[in-house]
Amino acid sequence: MCGIVGVVGNTNATDILIQGLEKLEYRGYDSAGIFVVGDNKSQLVKSVGRIAELQAKVGDSVSGTTGIGHTRWATHGKPTEGNAHPHTSGSGRFVLVHNGVIENYLQIKETYLTKHNLKGETDTEIAIHLVEHFVEEDNLSVLEAFKKALHIIEGSYAFALIDSQDADTIYVAKNKSPLLIGLGNGYNMVCSDAMAMIRETSEYMEIHDKELVIVKKDSVEVQDYDGNVIERGSYTAELDLSDIGKGTYPFYMLKEIDEQPTVMRKLISTYANESGDMNVDSDIIKSVQEADRLYILAAGTSYHAGFAAKTMIEKLTDTPVELGVSSEWGYNMPLLSKKPMFILLSQSGETADSRQVLVKANEMGIPSLTITNVPGSTLSREATYTMLIHAGPEIAVASTKAYTAQVATLAFLAKAVGEANGKAEAKDFDLVHELSIVAQSIEATLSEKDVISEKVEQLLISTRNAFYIGRGNDYYVTMEAALKLKEISYIQTEGFAAGELKHGTISLIEDNTPVIALISADSTIAAHTRGNIQEVVSRGANALIIVEEGLEREGDDIIVNKVHPFLSAISMVIPTQLIAYYASLQRGLDVDKPRNLAKAVTVE
């Protein structure tokens, strides 16, 4: 949600800012803007809508050596040019961009800013006026005024501040919102995400919560809010320009769906050696062994991935697994077992709700494992342990390959722990072989895109509602399938256990209601699901059946190659991802950037 990019000391600041904002589009936004300063002149340009509209307004007229840019996803105030960032102080001297939510902005306004002319509706405007207030009223330097403001401001934030009288410095601070420093040769950068700086640098420096950074073209100094200097090393990010481009694909989502077989094979090479033995950190294995219950905490697609792996983990490790929605657990922690362990699933590693849970876990001394796609992310830094899903950059808002990679990574964890526990079922589960079969199954499904596209056009082109049904692991897949379809096609979709039809939901079935059924369990469960299909068809529903090989009947629509039951949630989700993609495409929607959604939810 929202994105920041800044550069100091480069003659090409405007182009770098625009290119950086384009790389941050996937995070979600409704307006954007840049501020550029240099050669004793400065310019501020903002627009509502896409980056292309901002770029058209900028044209060739905006130039400078230092600047900050921002994509805004509205939280306080409507998406207007006035509320778009960057924001200026009353005199226009100070310019600020901000991600996050200032919780005490009304108190600050009433205490310090009664004489200030506040023009917008945002909490960000409060912050920049507060800095100017301390410069003018307390006669403080910009740095000291910024520090004083940071001591007062409460909430989540990532700030980048420029004094238009000083074209050589960007002041940066963060708390609970992601922000990185990019180190260049004769210039330095600041950004919410390393991907926005990939063209300019591969060397980065982390900023921890409640740290202030003074960024100049040839130096970066990290301080705490009391002015104590903090030594901080840098690291190199393993990113490639080809990873963040669409290539020949029309949309990132389709590219990322197609990348899933490669991701499965990457995980095999990461978490298993050439002999097929598990290559999972022994400290992680020991910590899971010592737990009497595992709590998987996540949001959205990651939450569904946790459900998809729950039964497998329990059967392979003999350890009970409980699922929790991070946004609920952050404020309503239930009664826990005596020796709990938290597993946090997050593609970005920056999910604010999950971080709130992790903060509480750390306070309680509960061991934690983050499973994420982003090394160096907040959750990976603050958890006891981390496992990476190695899915590569996921740009489309609708997550696909991160889901399947999370399930596969949990499979490696479960097998490793089960073997350490001496479980015969874990030892007999040839995960390397079975996951290779999954990769082949995915490839087979991907070869049927034209068939799936035609089925979608017949079933979903004009509908307003749809249902997914399934039993066992298929039920867990229906939840993810429904989320995918609703978030990018805007079709109101519900996924539920097929056996629950008669307990209420069947009342919504009418003529031509689309019902998509998943069948991958054993023949007995499959027979029950087919009975449920007949119930909805007899009431006028149009049914589409996705069935695993060996359970198919004449008239079934999509056949998925058979895989090990522990991994069926991976193979069965692939056709549902394609269904969502084609439903969105055929409705003329922006597949990669659905309305009102952000890729990384970094505010609560």
UniProtKB/Swiss-Prot annotation:
Domain of life of the native organism: Bacteria
Keywords of the record: Aminotransferase, Cytoplasm, Glutamine amidotransferase, Repeat, Transferase
All residue ranges annotated as the SIS domain in the record: 284-423, 456-594
Top enzyme class: transferase
InterPro entries from the UniProt entry: GATase_2_dom, GFAT, GFAT_N, GlmS/AgaS_SIS, GlmS/FrlB_SIS, Ntn_hydrolases_N, SIS_dom, SIS_dom_sf
Subunit: Homodimer.
Gene Ontology CC terms, in alphabetical order: cytosol
This protein's encoding gene: glmS
Recorded GO MF terms: carbohydrate derivative binding; glutamine-fructose-6-phosphate transaminase (isomerizing) activity
Keyword Cytoplasm tagged: yes
Function: Catalyzes the first step in hexosamine metabolism, converting fructose-6P into glucosamine-6P using glutamine as a nitrogen source.
Active site: 2, 599
PANTHER family the UniProt entry points to: GLUCOSAMINE--FRUCTOSE-6-PHOSPHATE AMINOTRANSFERASE, ISOMERIZING, GLUTAMINE--FRUCTOSE-6-PHOSPHATE TRANSAMINASE (ISOMERIZING)
Catalyzed reactions: D-fructose 6-phosphate + L-glutamine = D-glucosamine 6-phosphate + L-glutamate
EC number: 2.6.1.16
UniProt signal peptide: none
Main location class: cytoplasm
One Pfam family here: GATase_6
Protein name per UniProt: Glutamine--fructose-6-phosphate aminotransferase [isomerizing]
Compartment annotation: Cytoplasm
Ranges of residues in domain Glutamine amidotransferase type-2: 2-218
Gene Ontology terms: biological process: carbohydrate metabolic process; fructose 6-phosphate metabolic process; protein N-linked glycosylation; UDP-N-acetylglucosamine metabolic process
